[in-house]
Amino acid sequence: MTLHEWIYQREIRGQVTFSANEVYSMPGMSASTAKTELARMVVRRRVQNVYKGFYVIIPPQYALKGIVPATYYIDSLMQYLNKPYYVALLSAAALHGATHQRAMLTQVMTVSPRPNISEKNGQIDWSFRKDVPESLLLSENSEMGIIHYSNPELTAVDLIQYAKHIGGYQRAATVLAELADEVDISKISDVLPYTSYAVIQRLGYILEYVLFEQEKADKLYSVVCHDKRKWHLVLLSNEHPKDELADANRWRVNM
């Protein structure tokens, strides 16, 4: 069986990703021949090398560009890397209906160290955290499998925690305005073990003073105010010296 035939057989069975080691193990296929054939198929836009030793078969609808969107293969890739993950930030917000600030690349959260994805072929914008809160993830069918993504509450908190990564607090607030109806404030307590009180303070401040979501702000305050010993004076951003801080509002957040 030729490599072309082998790839076709995988494709019709719905197996759209494969590793180089699987090709090397084909009967009668030497490693050097396999590398040459794989390189040719990349040039011909039959397959895309999205990670060292990991390939995705390019379906006809993406053949012209030669690049497959990350949602097509992200679950298989992360299983290959043996890393937990979830689609996060602007990409997760879009899945919840907040589409006006959609990210150009698929934003994916995982644990360090950073996967060595090719910048040329990569369609992924990586962010990192200490651990992945799997209990706060949802799943959805993609074109060829499933993807895991953050629930509305984790998405809201991540938008604040990683505001710099997505373009700042103004952009985070714009997305939160669209996302707010999906967020169950009472469930924010489930996110607390995976973030800091400073992030929650900033989220509350934005809800109350930027988005004027008074009811949600009040509810959030009631959820988290029981342990204000962990609250410190914080800045909305870190552009000013801390000695300028004043206890100006109940969230203890200064502009």
Q: Residue locations for each model-derived region?
A:
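A residue-level signal for conserved active-site and pocket-lining positions in enzyme catalytic cores
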Residues: 23, 92, 156
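Short amphipathic alpha-helical segments with coiled-coil-like heptad repeat character
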Residues: 31-33, 100-102, 164-168
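Short N-terminal helix-initiation segments at or just after the protein's N-terminus
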Residues: 17-22, 34-38, 94-101, 231-243
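Hydrophobic alpha-helical interaction segments
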Residues: 137-255
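Short charge-dense sequence patches
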Residues: 6-7, 38-48, 102-111, 120-128, ...
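A generic structural signal for short, non-catalytic loop/turn and secondary-structure boundary residues
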Residues: 11-13, 48, 82, 101, ...
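Short gly/ser-rich loop at a beta-strand->alpha-helix junction or flexible surface loop bordering the NTP-binding
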Residues: 20, 49-61, 67-132
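Short beta-edge/loop segments at beta->alpha junctions of small alpha/beta modules
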Residues: 1-84, 181-201, 208
